[in-house]
């Protein structure tokens, strides 16, 4: 127990130290506090984007899904999330340019700048906040699981402890503190998950032997649609689409588009992302699959999300167990801190400042703050504390497994995707039609949550996004909106022929990722993994290569037309 306590305390000390170090480098402006004065270099941007996106869901949720349904979960997440990185250029590059030109910091500010609609701006803030809170709640939930297993402290006490530590270093260091802790925590998570897989597999004679033992009793874990028949081709397609639509709408990811030092950081991040997802996501899923050897059935009252700490407690030495579960804490804290910092900036800049500008005209009525654009620091920080308490309240009585909770959250955010793309690329998009599309979309999310509508053999996100896009397009055409702004995309960076060629290439890649012809194929290959696991790992490499070539083409095209 002493070793475990020392590991956890040491980890907290490092995080708080990074936060205080970042505070000393702060420049004392709102832009610096929230996006580090747009100076984040490419490698740091890549690591903070990854660490922010890979949350408790990545560690605990993926392992739980591996235990429940098998390796069918890996391609959905690895290739689907890697392919999603294409939006780092499609949305990220024009967002970065507009942010730099106009001093934008938050996602709703971008929408307001492009449409001039304060109602649409507030609606974006509301949707992003409402649908981030359940995802935010996953992080203290996972912290409670980890510390309960690690130190034996009560589940909710562990959740509260992690939340307090995270608030301390976030308030001190701002975005600089968050990105530097992301680099530390992301690297720690990757290394220690590799260690965990090696130790657990070693207890069963290596990966090949362990996989053979699992396959004898649970062959469905090595084929699609997976144990329980969850991942039918329609559901598979729905998940693949969901990640591309929802991930760039995470407010904490969206805000990082502004933080890049240059567009090169976004293209570098896009190129490296599929390589990381292809490697990293296999690790927790493998732990979950091997968990069937020790826990064919879970202990009474335990959800599948608990399989990782259960396996570590069963097979790992105390020091390794402490380090790996601390890596899991790293994953969840790197997401939680970013979520709260971004929501803090949105509350300050998209709610408080517009209200102040409208109703408070006399100079000096509201005190100045270096970190919230003219508002008292306690205003945005109090909002963050309130959100953290809401997350803890949800964690106190968790409503579902991480996977179920995440899917609901992601669908709500995906509704915003058509409006963002329309605002960036369609000059005649109507703000009124955009508002209507979001209201209709979130109404459909509620209807699907209540099981009032048919699913058509796929995830709700597919019919919902089709409906919201139709409302947006038809409404804009009927309202005949006048052009509002100049195009945000560098129109000469790629020729129309090149754009068509790239579109065909990525459409073909996405189609290969929906390989319905391989359903039911349970053949195994190297180290006992299903052969199609290696196929999707290869697709992640191909995707990375195509992204790199696209980045080069964009850079060359831009230079040629200067």
Q: Where do the model's predicted regions map?
A:
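Membrane-embedded helix-loop-helix hairpins and adjacent transmembrane boundary segments
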Residues: 1-523, 530, 538-543, 548-562
